[in-house]
Amino acid sequence: MLVLGLETSCDETGVALYDSERGLLADALFSQIDLHRAYGGVVPELASRDHVKRMLPLIRQTLAEADCVATDIDAIAYTAGPGLVGALLVGASCAQALAFAWDIPALGVHHMEGHLLAPMLEENPPQFPFVALLVSGGHTQLVRVDGIGQYELLGETLDDAAGEAFDKTAKMMGMQYPGGPEISKAALQGVPGRFVFPRPMTDRPGLAFSFSGLKTSALNTWQQCQSAGDDSEQTRCDIALAFQQAVVETLTIKCKRALKQTGLKSLVIAGGVSANKALRVSLESMLGELRGHVYYARPEFCTDNGAMIAFAGCQRLQAGQKEDLSISVQARWPMEQLSGL
């Protein structure tokens, strides 16, 4: 089965072709980072308009790269949520229109299920069951995964997602959008130990997260340094390092706790923050101690992309899942509502 995948949940327009027998044939991506940088964050209306502008050219590019034509495509998978409603509607409308014109099925895919399954596109994919850490700008969740659609939420953030905390902390210190990569880059020049921030909710049982207090601690420290006349680039780097260390250690502690609670030895990390090198090193070290394994997607598939949507959609389409041509998207969509295969 050859599936065309469309991703438009936020500020990346992603298109890919995935074949159930030959694997990923082609993928293309346009990032709107430069468009939104001047505003310090994603502007939903601008995001939607740019998706409209980019979608069809990217589809043509992907078909050409895979040496395919429209009649080769068996189905279309598109992101139906969660995400920005206007952006989601662009992808959904395009998918349903093409499906109607080509007389093929179209299926809405859960954005975070796409992220969760993205490591399965790699040469050494994880095997069920496993624990997944979904960590991005909008989500921080620990999920037990027994199969596609068989998800048990173990814990999630009570306030800010980890990626959101990275972005907001960077913005508070005058760094460019997106803040996550800027924090990581600055942390490389930081002096260890100059600042120490709390590891939120690690001193109590459970698998819930909270990053709003950590973000506030970083802000207060930066403002105190500014008041003392020390707002140098080195101070910014030192705070970035301390902040990143706190987030990474918090995530690692919770992942270790989830693995022990479930008795599993395999961990998948997915979502934009999974590209963070410090997080990968920390989790690999922890899994080494437990004699387990950690899996993640290649860096370009950690952020939003069409490949993960094409793959996730293909699994559900092959299992016989169908939907009509109505256009429906969801800004919020708990993964527990998904049906198992």
Curated annotation (Swiss-Prot):
Sequence positions that bind Fe cation: 111, 115, 304
Keyword check for S-adenosyl-L-methionine: no
GO cellular component, one term: cytoplasm
Textual note on the cofactor: Binds 1 Fe(2+) ion per subunit.
Annotated substrate binding sites: 134-138, 167, 180, 276
Keyword Metal-binding part of the UniProt annotation: yes
Entry's localization field: Cytoplasm
Reaction(s) the record says it catalyses: L-threonylcarbamoyladenylate + adenosine(37) in tRNA = N(6)-L-threonylcarbamoyladenosine(37) in tRNA + AMP + H(+)
Gene Ontology molecular function terms on file: iron ion binding; N(6)-L-threonylcarbamoyladenine synthase activity
Example GO BP: tRNA threonylcarbamoyladenosine modification
PANTHER family registered for this protein in UniProt: TRNA N6-ADENOSINE THREONYLCARBAMOYLTRANSFERASE, TRNA N6-ADENOSINE THREONYLCARBAMOYLTRANSFERASE, MITOCHONDRIAL
Described function: Required for the formation of a threonylcarbamoyl group on adenosine at position 37 (t(6)A37) in tRNAs that read codons beginning with adenine. Is involved in the transfer of the threonylcarbamoyl moiety of threonylcarbamoyl-AMP (TC-AMP) to the N6 group of A37, together with TsaE and TsaB. TsaD likely plays a direct catalytic role in this reaction.
Protein name as annotated: tRNA N6-adenosine threonylcarbamoyltransferase
Species per Swiss-Prot/TrEMBL record: Pseudomonas syringae pv. tomato (strain ATCC BAA-871 / DC3000)
